[in-house]
């Protein structure tokens, strides 16, 4: 009986998921292993050879072989990803002039300094691997995709950044022609929104709709962090999911093809406007895979979707897996929404369909539970008002996005633009006041410090709890689809 179960054939998706899980672990593990060019090629060939019997026989017993195969290929890809990074060992601690392309929209830190993320690096005309974190007091209007020259002392990097440069002096700033067209369209639209809506309110609305962060007042940005609301004003899976669901539902009854095309256009357009940050890369990939499955009448199990999407993002950029907190939090919150949330609802409410309020409550709570250990380990602080803040604000985010969009589109139409801007301002003002009030409470946040092994224990407990709820409810998670 045991042998029959071990030789039972599985659907190919489970074997691919196991392989992707191994690849993810392999890429992450490379960062903690010594470099070895000889082993690198052996790992690639070994991984390919091991996966052949997995594809041929598809036995349950071969799941572990699939994981090992993926792990070996992951080691190979991770080693390729850190090729050339050894040069930073010679550069750290020295003053250097580095040219690079601005990868994401610039941020403003608590001191009012500009934070830049550079890729396509060059030093003395030679290509330099990796990405650079730059902090500067320069106030010039630098945009995504600009080519800049930064001079300063290099210090050790963190996460996906190979090195950091603080108090950098910015020299040449070049804007390619035509440059990043999506940024130009976005900035043009943002100006239309600001025509009739006050600064703070327009900044919040544009944060919802376009992921714009730089224009947001520092005080409002800090209060949103304290209230646990940062995720709604950066380009995230939540904002993208709202847009994709809207596009699909508008056309689904008329034409499935038109619904798919409009939703896919929304995904590509939103990613072009907001940029390919780690969290946005994950969100776009997951939304695209889920949309394709819906269009072809298929379903993807969350336990397949998670490792597959993680592996694809790491194949594209293995540095995401080397301590990039945005990448980690993105997958943690996604796990909460597509696995923990359905289990909690089934466990406590049975087969009763969730209303909007209950769905938001459970999904928000689930995302916060799964991201909590990472947040405590990384920031040593926890928001005590996050759940309240999300319940007060999250239900109105889709309406705020719609009104902000309408305000921008109709801004040039006399009277109508101002008429649309009025309720938009009222709604956004309510959200700002709610966030400010919650952030002002003495008990709004507390300091908590945990170690990596305590973080691991917390996640082990979560996995155990989810396994228990799955066993008790017998919920089939394959029914979950984020685009429906």
Labelled PLM ranges:
Residues 1-86, 162-166, 282:
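N-terminal leader/targeting segments
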Residues 2-13, 21, 160-286, 291-292, ...:
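Aromatic-rich juxtamembrane segments at the membrane interface
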Residues 2-16, 20-23, 33-36, 417-484:
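C-terminal regulatory/interaction regions
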Residues 18, 59-62, 218-386, 450-484:
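Hydrophobic alpha-helical transmembrane segments in multi-pass membrane proteins
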Residues 26, 100, 152, 208, ...:
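Divalent metal-coordination and catalytic microenvironments
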Residues 79-99:
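Alpha-helical transmembrane signal-anchor/signal-peptide segments
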Residues 103-185:
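OB-fold single-stranded nucleic acid-binding module
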Residues 335-443:
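Alpha-helical transmembrane segments of multi-pass integral membrane proteins
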């Amino acid at each position: 009986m045991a042998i029959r179960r071990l030789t039972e054939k599985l659907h190919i998706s489970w074997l691919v998921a196991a392989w992707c899980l191994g690849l993810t672990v392999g890429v992450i593990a490379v960062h903690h292993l010594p470099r070895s060019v000889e082993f690198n090629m052996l790992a690639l060939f070994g991984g390919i050879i091991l996966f052949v019997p997995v594809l041929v026989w598809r036995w349950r017993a071969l799941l572990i072989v699939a994981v090992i195969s993926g792990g070996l290929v992951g080691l190979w890809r991770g080693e390729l990803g850190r090729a050339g990074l050894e040069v930073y060992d010679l550069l750290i601690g020295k003053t250097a002039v580095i040219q690079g392309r601005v990868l994401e929209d610039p941020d403003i830190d608590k001191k009012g300094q500009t934070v830049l993320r550079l890729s396509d690096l060059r030093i003395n005309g030679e290509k330099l691997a990796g990405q650079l974190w730059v902090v500067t007091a320069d106030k010039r209007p630098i945009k995504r995709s600009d080519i800049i020259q930064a001079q300063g002392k290099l210090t050790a990097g963190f996460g996906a950044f190979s090195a950091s440069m603080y108090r950098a002096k910015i020299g040449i700033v070049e804007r390619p022609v035509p440059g990043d067209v999506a940024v130009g369209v976005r900035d043009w639209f943002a100006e239309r929104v600001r025509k009739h809506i006050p600064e703070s309110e327009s900044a919040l609305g544009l944060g919802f709709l376009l992921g714009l962060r730089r224009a947001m007042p520092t005080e409002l940005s800090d209060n949103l962090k304290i209230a646990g609301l940062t995720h709604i004003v950066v380009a995230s899976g939540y904002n993208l999911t709202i847009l994709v669901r809207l596009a699909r539902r508008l056309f689904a009854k008329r034409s499935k093809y038109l619904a798919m095309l409009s939703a896919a256009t929304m995904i590509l357009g939103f990613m072009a406007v907001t940029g390919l940050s780690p969290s946005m890369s994950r969100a776009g990939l997951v939304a695209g895979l889920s949309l394709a499955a819906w269009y072809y009448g298929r379903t993807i199990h969350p336990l397949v979707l998670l490792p597959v999407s993680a592996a694809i993002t790491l194949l594209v950029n293995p540095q995401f897996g080397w301590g990039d907190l945005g990448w980690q939090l993105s997958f943690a919150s996604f796990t909460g929404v597509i696995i923990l949330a359905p289990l909690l609802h089934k466990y406590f409410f049975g087969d009763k369909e969730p209303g909007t309020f209950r769905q938001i409550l459970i999904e928000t709570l689930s995302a916060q539970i799964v991201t909590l250990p990472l947040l405590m380990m990384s920031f040593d602080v926890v928001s005590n008002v996050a759940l309240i803040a999300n319940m007060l604000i999250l239900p109105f985010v889709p309406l705020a996005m719609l009104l902000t969009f309408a305000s921008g589109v109709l801004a040039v139409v006399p009277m109508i633009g101002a008429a649309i801007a009025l309720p938009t301002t009222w709604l956004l003002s309510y959200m700002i006041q709610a966030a400010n009030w919650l952030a002002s409470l003495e008990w709004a946040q507390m300091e908590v410090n945990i170690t990596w092994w305590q973080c691991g224990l917390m996640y082990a407990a979560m996995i155990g709890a989810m396994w228990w709820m799955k066993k008790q409810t017998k919920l089939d998670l394959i029914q979950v689809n984020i685009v429906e």
